[in-house]
Amino acid sequence: MDIKKQTELIFEPILLPQDYKFELPENVEEIFINVASEVDLNGLYHKTTKSPLLLLYFQGNAKNMQNFLDNHSMILDWGYNVLVTDYRGFGKSTGMIDGEQNMYNDAEQIYDYALQLGYRPEDIILYGYSMGTSMAAYLATKKDAKALILESPYSSIAEIDIFGNQAPAYQLNTAARADEITIPTLLIHGEQDDVLPPDHSERIFANLQTQEKEMTVISKGGHGDLKSRSEYKESFNRFISNL
């Protein structure tokens, strides 16, 4: 299977017109980050004076930034700065994903953009949800950061039943990379996640090099409903307060 077909198999983008207007919460602005020639990633930046910390957030697979606003924007109310972008070909982002390294390179550019905003590495918490956990974990091995949070991660593409070994161009093997991660790490998974069962987190957790690691499995939690659970917020707050 060629890389174009592999890409189409894995990714589920929904485009938005360039003139699409988001209904943005207070203190949130729309941004574009140029990552390559004629490739600009659309994103949102939430600025607050309540904390110096930045959650550098990498989204899941399906849909686009509107999905973040509809289903995950509660993190904007947690008192932290937040930077989140769409992937190439998602939402209002231009270009197309054409390989795993392409995604990692974009993640590094987003990190560099955070530095340009004035954040120091020790201010940055790398935060990935679902597919975004691969980018967050990758950055944890390449860039300095305060901590890493992986919500509903997958250990590798090959370990996801619906993909198996059909997309060798996309390994996205966080479990294999975990032995290079040395910063404090929190994994959170839903007990009843029917997209990515908790054993994905267990494999990553077992391989982490850092000894400052925690894993929370939320009772009766699913794949996309964890942030609204009190157990999630308690685990998140405890982890941050101990950094």
Pin down the residues of each PLM region.
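Conserved alpha/beta-hydrolase
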Residues: 75-94
